[in-house]
Amino acid sequence: MQCARRGSPSGGPIDETPPKVVRLEPNQKTLNFNSDRIRIYFDEYIKLNELRDQLVVSPPLEQSKYLISPQGLPAKYLQIEFTDSLPSNTTYTFNFGQSIVDNNEGNVLPFYKYIFSTGSSLDSLSISGQINDAIKRNPDSFVSVMLYPYDSVFTDSIIFKDKPIYYTNTLDSLKEFTIENLKSGKYMLV
């Protein structure tokens, strides 16, 4: 018979897998959305990194109209709670960029999107492109791409007075962008 030896457990292989979505309340691409919250459940504890810089909501919502948790503490779900009613017949996209990471290793769930509509259909148009700079060979790696409605009230100063209806960012080195779930109409791309 021998005495136990002191030591630390060796652990296992390093986790290189990003978090996986296991359940949604309500489901992705829900129509006639009328709930006051959305919950996205994961297979492991997650945390949100740089949410303020990474999250893109299209069309934009005032930050006072929704709260996102967890912030600061790990959890097995992400919650979007609405503090005010949403306009009808609108398709919303919450793009989390690279903010959703697992708690232990920091593996990123890249560009996870949650999409829903307050109307009876989802807007399905999209636009994509690549950023080029006429002066520099290499454009900045972080570029904002914005769409403004091009209608009877459009003026060339709209970009200084109003927020864009849709926007995205080039958050990686590819300098490519895509904006999806657009409502049919004319837009100015900035």
Where are these regions (language model features)?
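Acidic, low-complexity Ser/Thr/Gly/Pro-rich repeat segments typical of extracellular/periplasmic
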Residues: 2-190
